[in-house]
């Protein structure tokens, strides 16, 4: 039997070393590749239902009172679709990092965090197509390096498990936009922000569906639908 192909859509928030933000979030929404078209169609149908154009790009930063019900419904769509899952890593405080101690650059650490996020998803009986929304100019280098790191770390030397790591722009992928929404909520909560009632309402919907601490504490290992790791550096190595 052919193995299962999983599409993984990754996004990142505040990942640069000196960007002025304390926290950083990486997140991935993933599903079987053969479900992607149907799920994307449901996403576009939801946009139409709320009077939005199908090509409207969903983003955490675009949440407004007028669109709050759409974004809350989108959380419900994600929650109700058994084929869609989320895995995230929250780094609450980048300022505690001291890469010199561990003889690594910020980029080395960045790939390590991506591996930490993705390794829980990578099963030997499946193959993975990983799509990254990389927002800086070094995207091509980062995708190549991440592919190498992932394959080496799981001993996938012929790249039969991690078949593909490539860039995609978020406006080209509905599922990537869901990742943006979820990591935006995690980042907002981690900074204790409350200025936008609409954003707080969307966060409340996430908590109602996945638990009050879903976006602020490490999930149990058995949480497969919505899984978050809150990462802090250890004394013996990052």
Q: For the regions a protein language model found, what residue spans apply to each?
A:
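Phosphate-ester processing/binding pockets and catalytic centers
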Residues: 1-238
């Amino acid at each position: 039997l052919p193995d299962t192909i999983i599409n993984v859509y990754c996004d990142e928030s505040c990942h640069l070393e000196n960007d002025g933000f304390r926290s950083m979030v990486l997140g991935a929404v993933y599903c079987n590749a053969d479900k992607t078209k149907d799920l994307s169609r449901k996403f576009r149908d939801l946009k139409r239902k709320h009077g939005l154009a199908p090509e409207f790009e969903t983003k955490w930063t675009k949440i407004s009172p007028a669109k709050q019900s759409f974004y809350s419904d989108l959380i419900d769509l994600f929650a109700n679709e058994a084929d869609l899952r989320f895995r995230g890593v929250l780094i609450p405080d980048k300022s505690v990092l001291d890469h010199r101690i561990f003889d690594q650059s910020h980029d080395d650490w960045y790939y390590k965090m991506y591996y930490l996020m993705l390794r829980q998803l990578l099963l030997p009986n499946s193959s993975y197509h990983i799509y990254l929304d990389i927002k800086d100019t070094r995207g091509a280098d980062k995708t190549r390096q991440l592919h190498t790191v992932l394959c080496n770390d799981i001993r996938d030397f012929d790249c039969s498990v991690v078949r593909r790591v490539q860039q995609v722009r978020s406006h080209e992928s509905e599922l990537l936009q869901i990742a943006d929404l979820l990591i935006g909520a995690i980042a907002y909560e981690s900074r204790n922000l409350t200025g936008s009632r609409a954003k707080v309402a969307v966060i409340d919907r996430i908590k109602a569906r996945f638990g009050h601490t879903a976006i602020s504490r490490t999930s149990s290992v058995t949480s497969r639908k919505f899984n978050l790791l809150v990462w802090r550096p250890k004394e013996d190595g990052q």
